[in-house]
């Protein structure tokens, strides 16, 4: 991807800079971060992610995994890669140590359908997500699993992720998705929106119009909201719940996965959307703004 972004833009779009806690919830947010750190320090976590043509964002993602993992007593990570034609395979090869950091590099000669909702795409994504799940199942037992995307431009807030750890530890949540911010180009100029609307199902499961989701900007620091499904490029799960699920490609793969967990007879608790766990997905670069119509 040939994107011209300045260092100042990158800094301005860090989640903690762009999306700070709402003044009403500053104290509650700080308490959740602190408790999340305490829980993490005695917990284990596995990070799993898909990767295809994830440059130039992949090194930042890997660095954030290291930074987040350092908050935990122990951590491991697994990348499921396929069909990259940029330097993604090379970066993952250098990163992997076949112990704590593992990568599966694959060439399936499948088309790159990054902006479609066809089953050709969703079935493949479900296959890759299930490979991640199998890796967790086959590995050492962990307390938590973090499922993430490897190509978010601004990455995620480590403190925000820790609030999900806190809410899961002291509440009845079996999993929490993230608030994923993006900026879209429109004829009227850039527009800030919620990203990953297709993965969201609030009180329903069937696919409906999700235009409303793009306007959903809940206050950072406010408490999680129960939803049937959501993702936002990063979600944290109790490991026992994560392993009960099974991805399928009938629609966005996260939806049947979350439904399979929710309907499992051994699942306790609920799933939700955490406004404090922030991911910055993408934005309109400064050089692109120069060409916006008046």
Name each model feature, range by range.
Residues 140-155:
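Short beta-strand-to-loop acidic/aromatic patch adjacent to the donor-nucleotide binding site
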Residues 152-246:
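Conserved catalytic core of nucleotide-sugar-dependent glycosyltransferases
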Residues 43-45, 68-78, 100-102:
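Short loop->beta transition adjacent to catalytic acidic/histidine clusters or analogous donor-positioning motifs
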Residues 91-142:
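Active-site-proximal specificity loops/subdomain of glycosyltransferases
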Residues 53-61, 95-96, 152, 168-169:
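Catalytic phosphate/metal-binding cores of nucleic-acid and nucleotide-processing enzymes, i.e., regions
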Residues 2-67:
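N-proximal low-complexity "stem/linker" segments adjacent to membrane-targeting elements
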Residues 55, 80-92, 110-112:
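A conserved acidic beta->alpha catalytic loop
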Residues 3-19, 215-294:
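C-terminal catalytic/acceptor-binding lobe
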């Amino acid at each position: 991807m040939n994107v011209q972004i300045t260092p100042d833009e990158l800094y301005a779009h860090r989640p903690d800079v762009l999306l700070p806690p709402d003044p009403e919830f500053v104290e509650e947010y700080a308490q959740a971060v602190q408790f999340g750190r305490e829980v993490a320090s005695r917990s284990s976590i596995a990070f799993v992610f898909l990767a295809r043509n994830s440059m130039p964002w992949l090194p930042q993602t890997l660095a954030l995994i290291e930074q987040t993992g350092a908050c935990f007593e122990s951590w491991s990570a697994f990348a499921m890669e396929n069909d990259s034609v940029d330097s993604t395979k090379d970066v993952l090869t250098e990163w992997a140590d076949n112990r704590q950091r593992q990568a599966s590099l694959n060439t399936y000669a499948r088309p790159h359908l990054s902006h479609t909702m066809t089953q050709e795409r969703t079935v493949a994504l479900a296959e890759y997500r299930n490979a991640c799940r199998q890796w967790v199942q086959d590995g050492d037992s962990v307390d938590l699993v973090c499922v993430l995307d490897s190509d978010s431009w601004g990455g995620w807030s480590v403190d925000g992720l820790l609030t999900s750890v806190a809410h899961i530890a002291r509440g009845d949540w079996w999993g929490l998705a993230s608030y994923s911010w993006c900026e879209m180009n429109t004829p009227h100029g850039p527009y800030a929106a919620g990203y990953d609307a297709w993965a969201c199902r609030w009180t329903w499961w069937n696919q409906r119009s999700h235009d409303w989701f793009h306007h959903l900007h809940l206050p950072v620091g406010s408490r999680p909201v129960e939803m049937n499904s959501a993702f936002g490029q990063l979600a944290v799960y109790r490991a026992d719940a994560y392993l009960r699920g099974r991805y399928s490609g009938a629609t966005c793969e996260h939806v049947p996965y979350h439904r399979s967990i929710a309907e499992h007879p051994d699942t306790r608790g609920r799933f939700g959307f955490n406004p404090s766990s922030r991911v910055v997905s993408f934005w309109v670069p400064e050089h692109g703004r120069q060409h916006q119509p008046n």
